[in-house]
Amino acid sequence: MPTVEELYRNYGILADAKDDVGQHKSAYQVILDGVKGGPKEKRLAAQFIPKFFKHFPDLSDAALNAQLDLCEDEDVSIRRQAIKELSQFATGENLPRVADILTQLLQSDDSAEFNLVNNALLSIFKMDAKGTLGGLFSQILQGEDVVRERAIKFLATKMKTLPEDILTKEVDDYIFSESKKVLYDVTGEEFVLFMKILSALKNLQTVSGRQQLVDLVSEQAGLHQTLNPADPDSVDRLLQCMRQAVPLFSKNVHSTKFVTYFCEQVLPILSSLTSPAEGIDVQLEVLKLLAEMSSFCGDMDKLESNLNKLFDKLLEFMPLPPEEVENGDSAANEEPKLQFSYVECLLFSFHQLGRKLPDFLIAKVDAEKLKDFKIRLQYFARGLQVYIRQLRLTLQGKSGDALKTEENKIKVVALKITNNINVLIKDLFHNPPSYKSTVTLSWKPVQKTDSGQKRMSDETSSTSPPKKPVVGPKRDSRQIYNPPSGKYSGNVGAFSYEQRGGFQGGRGRGWGGRGNRSRGRIY
């Protein structure tokens, strides 16, 4: 094993040789042997090996393996030095291998070491983006679970920091094709991260690009399969996929396939869906997704059939008035609860699809059923007016900070919901029914005005929906408000389904059966 002095002497030979450095193979071999020495010798070897690496192609494998030995040394300072210099080996055919190695080194739990690996990956990204991606995707597809997880997060967080000239069309196409391979077997969290990666690609900002992403989500959601309502993973998968699809829809990228699936496969089994997590009102989440998607539904093959399914589900949530006994009192101990959040979603969806078949209630629904529907509408409208008056009374005179308390924020949302329902019911009371009004769903952001707080009224909620839905609010936005009187019940809330970060049990359940990877160095 060479000493420190011998390492310096052979370094001097190579440094002084200048253009003839390649003729001093024995001197470079001495430096390679430095990895077998003590801490001082190893630190010097970690610096000297990469410096002359390119001059000795015959020793390239030996040099790279020597550096890798140092990257795995027990001494953290030696590891850091070796990793810091590793990008110098990323030349020609070696680059994908170096990228693969650096990707494996992402599993380090030492923060300084981890940052060095990130920086090294970014530096070789700028040399050859496609080659670097080859190493990353190799580990994502075949590496250990911890390496896979960190490689995906690297792509999701670091890609956006790269200059535009690096992410060429060829690179974008490569990312898309490799991502599709990965998506055959992903967890929920991984799927969300890949949608983040793909949605940011320049090539996929066009209408055709967005359509490709929608098709990708459609495959992941399993729209060709029958939904098993008893399997929480299947329900979770559907909900997470839909949340990724919603921001992609527009007037040119339609949600028809998804809305059709919801009407045909999900609505009939809505009440039997198993919640994917405690505290999730899965029925409400499904109905909110359907409402958001319905705005972008194109021509539908089975429109009348699906409108019927939607209509029947709406009837389930709109109770008949209680029967009265001779003295005029209600025969029941309590009047039916009015589930405003559900009805807002169902009415909105029905209103959106009804525009495509405006004579549905007149020509496609029999007279008795239509009469029953109008009775339910009238009863709901009466309860609605009572609720709106109560809410306006409690909010009267409040502005600014007073409206920012949790209780008042919930009441404001409740007022949005009831105003929306009021507008939609008025449309359906027209003869013939009208589908002209537009409302902004209660959980969607409203446009700010220069004059400050908007006055809460039917008019304020009757605004055009945004062309592109936004990502749902975070977990803490769940809002439930019970009316003061206790007579009318409202499950009132903004979209509350949080991104759980994975399907139950992670990979190996729900979205595929990836087993644990082998441990140890696989360079």
Curated annotation (Swiss-Prot):
Under SUPFAM superfamilies, the record lists: ARM repeat
- The UniProt annotation puts motif Nuclear localization signal at 454-475
Molecular functions (GO terms): fibroblast growth factor binding; RNA binding
Q: Where in the cell is it found?
A: Nucleus
Major site of localization recorded for this protein:
nucleus
Signal peptide coordinates:
none
Q: Which UniProt keywords apply?
A: Apoptosis, Nucleus, Repeat
Q: Where does the record place Gly residues bias? A: 502-515
Entry's Gene Ontology BP terms: apoptotic process; negative regulation of apoptotic process
Between which residues do disulfide bridges form? none
* Ranges where the record places region ARM-like and Heat-like helical repeats: 1-360
An annotated GO cellular component of this protein is:
nucleus
Region spans: Disordered: 446-523
Name the domain of life.
Eukaryota
Instruction: Cite the record's note on assembly.
Output: Monomer.
Q: Which protein is depicted?
A: Apoptosis inhibitor 5-B
Organism of origin is Xenopus laevis
The gene name reads api5-b
